[in-house]
Regions:
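Metal-cofactor-dependent catalytic cores
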Residues: 1-261
Length: 261
């Protein structure tokens, strides 16, 4: 089945705002520059919108050299260049990894803006995916997340709501599968691109956070729980979308076609 790439989103800083792009390079670790940075507490634990919803208000822009972060929480943006700072031992959901510290100026800016002591680190090394034999940067368990427009449309109909796709923070938005059609897709292929979809995407309280205001409500997690709770790997999770691992690398473009199988 042919499907359309309806949207592409890169998240330079884990748990911060998205950068919608018209084209993205698919690497072994996901979309180029996705989750390349992360904010960590003094003990190395990553910051997440689960505990700090204001992360949604950070608007990063990153070209591989210079990181610029705007936010309504600060009068002036942060502007800093990527540096090979001292390595720090950090964790993503208790899984150990490393990051290069990006200096005191960045740490002070983020700590003041978020009112949480933290430091900015840039990814270094390799991390294995939870399943599927891939690698990733600071994403939770898999380097690529996928969701279809039709699945969101169905959820909005059930809720009589108009939630935007931004609530669900997918890397790749698809059009043409039908509601929850991605559930049965195991492969997305295009010109020089091949993504294996490994498992459903388990959802948490982050999707209850308005990505424009950082305000949190009970929905849509409560609505999804009524009809999208499934068992995977011995645990029950609320599933919406799919997670995958790149198998062949190339460029993805909004408006481009992929073969879903």
């Amino acid at each position: 089945m042919l499907v359309i790439v309806a949207g592409l989103n890169v998240f330079p800083i884990k748990s911060a705002g998205a950068v919608p792009v018209a084209e993205a390079e698919l690497t072994t670790d996901g979309l180029r520059h996705d989750r390349e940075y992360m904010l960590v507490r003094p003990d190395g634990r990553h910051l997440s919108q689960r505990e700090v919803p204001e992360l949604a208000l950070l608007r990063p822009d990153y070209d591989g050299v210079k990181l610029v972060v705007h936010t309504p929480l600060a009068a002036s943006p942060l502007v800093c260049e990527a540096v090979d700072g001292p390595p720090l031992d950090v964790t993503v959901h208790r899984r150990p990894c490393q990051g290069m510290d990006q200096g005191d100026e960045a740490a002070e800016w983020f700590s003041e803006v978020l009112r949480v002591p933290c430091r900015l680190v840039r990814f270094v090394g390799t991390r294995p995916t939870a399943l599927g034999g891939g690698t990733l940067t600071y994403a939770d368990g898999y380097p690529v997340s996928v969701l279809s427009e039709e699945s969101l449309d169905d959820l909005n109909r059930r809720m009589d709501a108009r939630l935007p796709m931004a609530r669900f923070r997918p890397n790749i938005v698809l059009r043409g599968l039908g509601p929850y059609g991605e559930d049965s897709v195991t492969r997305l292929r295009g010109d020089h691109v091949d993504i294996e979809l490994i498992r459903p995407c388990g959802r948490c309280v982050i999707i209850n956070t308005d990505q424009d205001t950082a305000r949190r409500s009970p929905e849509p997690l409560r609505a999804l729980a009524r009809y999208r709770t499934e068992r995977f790997g011995g645990t029950r999770e609320i599933m919406f979308g799919r997670l995958g691992v790149p198998r062949a690398l190339g460029a993805l473009r909004v408006g481009g076609e992929l073969t879903a199988s």
